[in-house]
Amino acid sequence: MAIKRPKGTQDHLPDGSPKLSLDTRAAAFTFVRETARRVLERAGAQFTDTPLFEEAELVQRGVGGSTDIVRKEMFTVYYFGDHGGFILRPEGTAGLVRSYLQNGLKQLPAPLKLWTHGPMFRAENVQKGRLRQFHQVDYEVLGSADALVDAEAIALMTEVVRALGVQKVKVKLGSIGDPEDREAYNTYLRELFTPHLEALSDDSKDRLNRNPMRILDSKSESDQTLIAQLGVRPMLDFLGEGARTHFEQVQAYLNAWDVSYEVDPSIVRGLDYYRRTAWELHHEGVGAKSALGGGGRYDGLAQELGSKEVVPGIGWAFGIERLLLAMDAEGVALPETSGPLLYVAAMDDENVTYAATVALTTRRTARAEFAYRAMKPAAAFRDAERRGARFIALIGSDEVAQDTLSIKNLQTGQQSKVQTRDLQAFLAGQADQHSPAIPHDPTPQEKA
């Protein structure tokens, strides 16, 4: 029996693969990451990264023991004599805050803007837009409790998504108040739901004591029916003066910047460390629950992880796979990836090394590939065209003796005879017509 990839995972495939789709196209993931990098780094965010596995206690304390993530969805790591003290990270925020505290990043100018991307792991039921290994872009700001920081974070999230060509998104904005506001709301919910305990799902019965607010985002249809029947008051009704003023300020900034949003009293974040601002970004084309991602403020997280000081923080994340589904639903076409600018082939065995040297030299300034064995011209042309090359250089004994290259433009059919020493200048004149479709960081040679 052939070994297959685990359920709930995907291979990211090169262009031209027979089973290619937008959400399995490796170039699509590169495009999303590079677009996010450009937008976020222009806003002052710095890239960081954390391990794929962390201490289980980090997630238990940082995410919250009452969440589905901790109770049902963690992948535990076992090795040698270990007894399961590590987990594959289910989200990025707790690890980034742990890194901030452990590495003394509070010494850097505040607020500190960080961003990252990478795989996350949750043992979820697999469905459209829900995978067990999925990929996120994550943005965090540490060191400021200002409402202006919240508004900027929301604006940046929408800017990244729109830069990717996705327009039909909706920001659903809410607030879950301060700890005392949440406690008052939880007391209200316990009193409301306790007489109807038998009508709750088993999960929600457990949540009633641990974290009643989590009942409101239950996936159980019977729970949602009961919530509607009881006419549950929204969290916004319980905001104290500080949280309410903060929420109004966030909206004022968004209005000033023409960032479209709707206030949604039902927004309840599933993670226990959130305070005040919370939001979700929705798109109808992504399947389950339609959320591309979300974010919120988590001023209590650093102390939960052992900090002696309050470290205000806010952040967001979106799933790359879900975003690609939204792009597909809107018919967004990725820029075409380009093949090599130059393909070099030797026509006889003794000149293969020479051809390879020409290609390697060309790579100082442009993308080039070469044939690993001697080829007849017809076969070389076919191979170059399959690879999407723009130019082909055929090298035989005459070319080597004369130190020249016979170059043909595969798009126009134009042929040129170029001195080998002039190849870089010849190709430089073509570079602006053959720039890569996927944005990239310049090489040291390109910087020079």
From Swiss-Prot:
It catalyses: tRNA(His) + L-histidine + ATP = L-histidyl-tRNA(His) + AMP + diphosphate + H(+). Its EC number is 6.1.1.21. It is found in: Cytoplasm. It comes from the Bacteria. Pfam families: HGTP_anticodon, tRNA-synt_His. GO terms for cellular component: cytoplasm. One of its GO terms (biological process) is histidyl-tRNA aminoacylation. Residues 1-20, 428-448 are annotated as: Disordered. The keyword Thylakoid does not apply. PROSITE patterns: AA_TRNA_LIGASE_II (PS50862). Keywords: Aminoacyl-tRNA synthetase, ATP-binding, Cytoplasm, Ligase, Nucleotide-binding, Protein biosynthesis. One of its GO terms (molecular function) is histidine-tRNA ligase activity. Transmembrane segments: none annotated. HAMAP family: His_tRNA_synth (MF_00127). Belongs to the class-II aminoacyl-tRNA synthetase family. Homodimer. PANTHER family: HISTIDINE--TRNA LIGASE, MITOCHONDRIAL-RELATED (PTHR43707:SF1), HISTIDYL-TRNA SYNTHETASE (PTHR43707). NCBIfam families: hisS. This is Histidine--tRNA ligase. It comes from Deinococcus deserti (strain DSM 17065 / CIP 109153 / LMG 22923 / VCD115). The lineage of its organism: Bacteria, Thermotogati, Deinococcota, Deinococci, Deinococcales.
